[in-house]
C-alpha cells in the first residue's frame, strides 16, 4: 500500500473496522476469517487413506461466484456472505455445508459454490442459487487440521495420491469440500473433508 490511509481504507472495506479499532479491542473474534492470498500448495501433506464411495446426487442451495486464478484467496469472503443465510434456508437436510468447484481451469479460474443440501428446490430464496451436484464415485479424504491447509490438502491429493492410486479424476463431476458439525466457521478449526471424484 502506498500510504497508511490506503491500508486503513482497504482494511476497513474488508473487515468492517479499522486496524486501530481491532488493536484497541485486543481481540480477533469479530474479524472474518480470510485465507492468505498466496499459500504454498506445493508442499505435500501426510493424509490418511481415503474411503472410496459412491455418493448420490445432491441438491444444494447457496452462493456461487467465478473466481479468476488470482482471486482464489477471496473464497472465504463468499463463505462469510453465505454464513449469514445458514440456518434460514428452507427444506435444508442438515447443518453440513459444502464447497463445490463446479468448474476449474487455469484460463477461466474456479466457478465455486458454497451451500447446504436441501430436500428440493421448491422454496429457494431469491438471492441464492440452486444447483444439482451429480452422483459420483469419490475418494473421500479427511483433513483434521485448520482450514488454511485446504490448498495443500488438494495439492497432495492431485499430485501425490492420484497418480499412484489406480484411479483418474472424473472430469464430469465436481470436487467437493465438506464442513460437518465439528468444523468451526469462525475459527477455521475442527477439520474438513475433501471429496475427489474418481473413475477407474
What are these regions (language model features)?
Residues 2-200:
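A solvent-exposed interaction/effector surface
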